[in-house]
A protein has these predicted regions:
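Hydrophobic hinge/microswitch elements
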Residues: 129-132, 136-142, 148, 202-260
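Short beta-strand-centered segments that line the small-molecule binding cleft or hinge
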Residues: 85, 109-113, 130-174, 182, ...
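A short LG(V/I)-centered, amphipathic sequence patch enriched
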Residues: 40-59
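N-terminal short secondary-structure element
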Residues: 1-35, 64
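Hydrophobic/proline-rich hinge and linker segments of small-molecule sensing/allosteric domains
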Residues: 160-201, 270-280, 294
Length: 298
C-alpha cells in the first residue's frame, strides 16, 4: 500500500474538497485525482461519492479513513523511533550486574535517572557473576556490566572498564561464635578450622576467587560445609550456625538476626565494583549510559 496515496486520501477525506486538498498537499488537482483513482483500484472499492456540488465518503471510504490514519501515524512513529535509536534516545540496553551491586544506593539512582532522561530506551537487567559477564560481553549477549573482579583478575583487553565503587570483605559469623564479640579486626587464619558457607565455584574472576585467594594467603584452603549461590542465603545459613563466611561489607545493611559482621585484618580484603563494556562498542545508547554512570557514580 502506497503511503503517499493514503496521505492524499486523508487530505481529501478531511477537506471533502479536491481543490482544497490539493492546496494543502502543495500539488495540482489532476495528480491528486489520479492518486485517488489508483487507490480505489488498489482497494477494489469506490471511496468517494463525487458530484458537482459536494464530495462525500462512501461506507468503504469511511472505513478506510480510520485505518489510514492509524497506518500513517504508525509510519511516523516508526520513523521517529528509528531516528531516536540512531541518536541513542531509543533502543534496548542489556545490563548485567553481580548480586551485591543493587545494594549500592548509587545503582538504583543512576538507573532511575537514565530511565527518566531516556524513556524510550528499554532496560533489560540480568543477574550474572563476573565471569559470566565477561563471557556474555564477548559473545555480544549483553551491552554493559557491573562486576566485582578479584584483585588478581585481569579483565581481557577487548573489554573496557571503569572502577565505580570500593568496599571491603568482612567476616560473617554466627552471633554465638566465640569471635563474634571481638573488638578488633580478625585475621582470617584464626578461622582456618571453621566450616565455611561460600558461593559454589562458577565462571571465575569474581568474589569466590577473591575469597579463595584470601584463604590461600592466610595459609589454608577453606572447608566448604555448605555452598550457596546467593549471598543472602549464605548469611541466613551463617545465622543458623552452619558455618562462617566472607562477604562484601555492603551486605551488612541486610544482615539477618543471628549473624554479625566483623572486619578482616588481612591486607587483601579490599574489593571494588567495575563498569565494563566492549572496547569497540559504538551503540549511542551504550555510550550515553557509560557517560552518565561515570558522571554520577559518587
Amino acid at each position: 500500500m502506497d503511503l503517499r496515496r493514503l496521505t492524499c486520501f486523508l487530505a481529501v477525506a478531511e477537506e471533502l474538497n479536491f481543490s482544497r486538498a490539493a492546496q494543502r498537499l502543495h500539488m495540482s488537482q489532476p495528480p491528486l485525482s489520479q492518486q485517488i483513482r489508483l487507490l480505489e483500484q488498489e482497494m477494489g472499492a469506490q471511496l468517494f461519492e463525487r458530484s458537482r456540488r459536494a464530495v462525500s465518503l462512501t461506507p468503504a471510504g469511511a472505513l478506510l479513513q480510520d485505518k489510514a490514519r492509524q497506518i500513517v501515524a504508525l509510519h511516523q512513529q516508526a520513523g521517529e523511533l528509528c531516528r531516536m535509536a540512531a541518536s541513542g534516545l531509543a533502543g534496548r540496553l542489556r545490563i548485567a550486574f553481580t548480586a551485591s551491586v543493587p545494594l549500592f544506593a548509587q545503582f538504583s539512582r543512576m538507573l532511575g535517572e537514565f530511565r527518566q532522561r531516556y524513556p524510550q530506551v528499554e532496560l533489560d537487567l540480568q543477574h550474572m557473576t563476573t565471569g559470566e559477564q565477561i563471557a556474555a560481553l564477548t559473545a555480544g549477549q549483553i551491552d554493559v556490566g557491573f562486576m566485582r573482579p578479584s584483585p588478581a583478575f585481569r579483565i581481557p583487553l577487548p573489554i573496557r572498564e571503569q572502577t565505580l565503587w570500593r568496599d571491603e570483605l568482612m567476616l560473617a559469623l554466627p552471633a554465638a561464635h566465640e569471635q563474634a564479640a571481638a573488638g578488633t579486626p580478625l585475621a582470617l587464619r584464626a578461622l582456618a578450622e571453621q566450616p565455611f558457607v561460600l558461593h559454589p565455584a562458577v565462571l571465575g574472576g569474581g568474589l569466590h576467587e577473591h575469597i579463595l585467594a584470601l584463604c590461600s594467603e592466610a595459609g589454608f584452603v577453606p572447608r566448604i560445609a555448605q555452598p550457596a549461590r546467593e549471598t543472602a542465603t549464605m548469611l541466613a545459613l551463617v545465622a543458623a550456625g552452619l558455618g562462617v563466611s566472607v562477604v562484601p561489607s555492603v551486605y551488612e545493611r541486610i544482615c539477618p538476626p543471628g549473624a554479625v559482621f566483623r572486619p578482616l585484618a588481612d591486607a587483601a580484603r579490599h574489593s571494588r565494583i567495575a563498569l565494563v563494556c566492549r572496547q569497540d562498542e559504538s551503540a549511542p545508547c551504550v555510550q550515553m549510559f557509560w557517560q552518565q554512570v561515570c558522571a554520577v557514580r559518587d
